A protein has these predicted regions:
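Bulky hydrophobic segments
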Residues: 2-142
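Short, highly charged, low-complexity non-transmembrane loops/tails of multi-pass membrane proteins
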Residues: 142-149
Length: 149
């Protein structure tokens, strides 16, 4: 027997339903913020100017992975984003003419970086934790909203 009013669908906070359009919007905002942190670095507090770009880059990676894999868990996204970000950073230890030529290009430098820094790994961790934390909070709020009478 079917019912006219089925139980409302509940969301599992471990597997949030990500809206790719929203994530794309946030992705673009983070890119703009990252570029602005470089452009306006001289007038920003030194700690922001020094670390915001790398922190926002990792948040952008987290959001990008969320767009690509909207049904994966938040933890999975964080682990994959961290692995990708750390791999890019450790790749900066390797120097060959072909990859250094790519790094000299503005876009290549933004994506691949130019030199290995331990502080970048800390920034990546913070950026991904920000994404993880915001998505976890959002998922719980959304689940509570959908489960309320």
């Amino acid at each position: 027997m079917t019912t006219l009013n089925p139980e409302p669908r509940t969301l599992n906070p471990a597997f949030p339903l990500r809206n790719r359009l929203w994530y794309f919007g946030f992705f673009c905002l983070v890119i703009v913020a990252g570029l602005a942190s470089r452009r306006f670095g001289p007038i920003l507090p030194k700690v922001i100017a020094a670390y915001a770009g790398d922190t926002l880059w990792a948040l952008m990676v987290f959001l990008g992975f969320g767009m690509l894999w909207p049904k994966r868990s938040t933890l999975w996204l964080a682990v994959m984003a961290a692995g990708f970000s750390y791999l890019i950073e450790f790749s900066q230890i390797y120097h060959a003419p072909w990859i250094d030529a790519i790094r000299q290009n503005r876009l290549g430098g933004l994506v691949l970086g130019r030199g290995f820094l331990w502080s970048d790994l800390v920034c990546y961790s913070i950026g991904i934790l920000i994404g993880f934390g915001l998505e976890t909070i959002w998922s719980k709020m959304r689940a509570n909203h959908h489960n309320s009478p």
